[in-house]
């Protein structure tokens, strides 16, 4: 998305500080767990049980983000109820029940404003590095032991009471990223946890124990067992993080990231992108273009390997095509700018300008900002589509 103007870096920083401060106050005064729809869900689950029995708790990312004052998107709930009990309880309600992962004890409740994923408490019986055979239980501590990181095993009930059997809140407060139990064993249970490790390391700039780093490097070959679709989903989550541009600051993290994604040949280009990121929003497609595109069509290999979406494929192809044009057409951002905005769209040209600066070391910041201002000032005419004049 285009910001609509060319804000200075200090102005944008001040805006972000104010926005985060307001959000923090808002979340403290109106915590997510007090939402009316969520309370209806918890009350429905509790029906038929005595008040001293905890039937459901929030868990995972929503609790972690609540504690760190981040925006909460996905809502995960752990419960002692079976999927059949959940379906029966919500059969004649305003919530639609979707069997998203019923083989693993998961269903999703969909309402007007929320999608809530409910999973029955469980323990792993057998794992193969990709999937697990599970047994359903009603023991909260045992359920916590099968989760990946301590910071993802913090539970929160409908009244805001924390249950933290793995001391995840302590690790979150002290910037520690720890597997629950033996790192080697946890990684071997599901090799996707290696990629998830990168996501949380980038997200919180967390301190990692040497045993964890060693276990990850020793098990990198296991990534080959994971479907490319699952890996791509995690990668896109990583690229959406505001801290991703700092990945080069940790040689250890960069090494692991490069081993998992050897297609990203141009991580150094991120250093130039860091100089201009404040001028526009940076999305995953821009980052992919910066790290992938070269004269050998490296991006095509990535698209094929990870079966990227048609949208991503088309966007990268368009970036590549126009970067080639930029080399040939010296007037691309000059006399031909209006024409190129008309045929490609203003958003695309803003992104292309970012990518071109990141890739081409000969482009100065002055040239970049000058081009950006010209793009933003162009008014693209809206033509009527109903035949009227």
Q: Which sequence ranges carry the predicted segments?
A:
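Catalytic cores of the polymerase beta-like nucleotidyltransferase superfamily
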Residues: 14-389
